[in-house]
Amino acid sequence: RNHAVMSSYEPGSIFKPIVAAAAIDAGVARPNDTFFCENGKFKVGNAKVGEAVNHKFGWLTLQDIIVKSSNIGSIKIARQLGKRSYYDYIRKFGFGQKTGIGLPGEAGGQLKELSAWDPMSLASISFGQEIGVTPIQMTSAISAIANGGTLMVPRITRAILKDGQIEKRFEPKIARRVISIQSSRQVVDILKHVVKDGTGKNAAVKGYEVAGKTGTAQKYDPKTRSYSKTAYVSSFIGFAPADAAKVAILVMIDTPQGVHYGGSVAAPVFSNIVRETLRYLNVPSNDQLVYILDRA
């Protein structure tokens, strides 16, 4: 089974850059705008929402909401957007529909029609619950942020060769513009701080600037009809080099044993993959770029 295109997961906190990007692009919030995060407990309808590790955040900027991964802060950002605008951005980012990658069995994920949203939906989706995404959807969406706001149709190859000659070429294909270039740059800067100062420090790669987001999603247990307190999907999604991305990678670990936080489990794997991939692609490190500029 090709989980990258056939399996859907609740993404958890790796979905938070989507609400941040939407709010910034819609002009309803800026990275330095502050939101009160209710000291760790917030009532939404009949439900109570808390923070991971029982954090008790007070006032946080939008940037720090993403850097520190505040669930309540994400809800506050989503409320600034409103249901209709947030739903439209989620669709523009490619969720709830197939990416068109062309691989057999691709799933479209799960995104309820706006008319089916209940009072909790806006809040839940803001921090990556009540929505199902495929890994290729999530990677395509984060790539749109890295690409200056343009969503591309993913491809698995650039060309087909026969006897050393190009038989068929697959040109890059733009799906649509999702957010502006300026908005994308602001979100990229936020995601760089996640790795520099926040939950994603273990994703850092020496010599390169990395941008990304951690996620620790509780798995839904259909037997109890509630979220498990012992089973998680731990993840890290990001790209590098941050300001001129060559690779975007999602690491998802289904039901890790022991430590389960994405920043501890998935981020180090991401770091190792990115380091070796950039080396394989001969992408110069920051030190090499400085040397080249000095020589010039």
Show where each model-derived region lies.
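Short, gly/Ser/Thr-rich active-site loops of penicillin-recognizing serine hydrolases
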Residues: 165-168, 267-296
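Beta-lactam-recognizing serine transpeptidase/beta-lactamase-like catalytic domain environment
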Residues: 1-13, 18-253, 292-296
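A short acidic/glycine-rich loop-to-helix N-cap element
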Residues: 254-265
